[in-house]
Amino acid sequence: IRYKGDQEIGAVSWARLRQFADGRREIERPRYEGDRQGRPFVVTADRGVLQAPGAGTDPNQLPEETRLVGHVEFREQNGMTILAQEATFHESSGTLDVPGPVTFSDGKVSGGGVGALYDRQLQVLTLRDQSRVTMAPGAGGGGGFTGTSKTMLVNRQTHFLQMDGGATIVRERETLAADNTQVRLTDANDGVTLMQLRGH
């Protein structure tokens, strides 16, 4: 358990723990629960590999970094879900670093790519390669789109998408292509208020 003053901000549980002489630990079915800035979240996986802070450390003391393997799921109470097969969770900053394929969903917005970093404090997801995003159509059947680019930044606080490198947007009646595309979403993330395309 980790505290900030008298307030509990994180706890970890597992089904089985093995500890080695070099301080390395392996845990089965790890579950990390945190609550920072009033935004509860949960991280789970099939297995976790971590390094103890020091010799003789209490097994319940949370490490700074945990490598997660198998069915990694990062879920925030306010809507963001990230799925991967491998990731590294940094406890103190609440960031999730994914080296391989990843998918995400946040209300009507979903997508994925290869390689990603999610910063909980900034509420920003960065997709590093083969990025894609989909907005589901509204109640009337309009307003939806799909987009692809090399890299993509999804800023949940400002409701903003930045697509860089061969950006393509496909809407109901048109396909748009540019080097870079910026998309501004509604506050509810259920529609587009502005779209800017730059370059060929």
Model-derived segments and their meaning:
Residues 1-200:
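Mature-chain termini and adjacent capping regions
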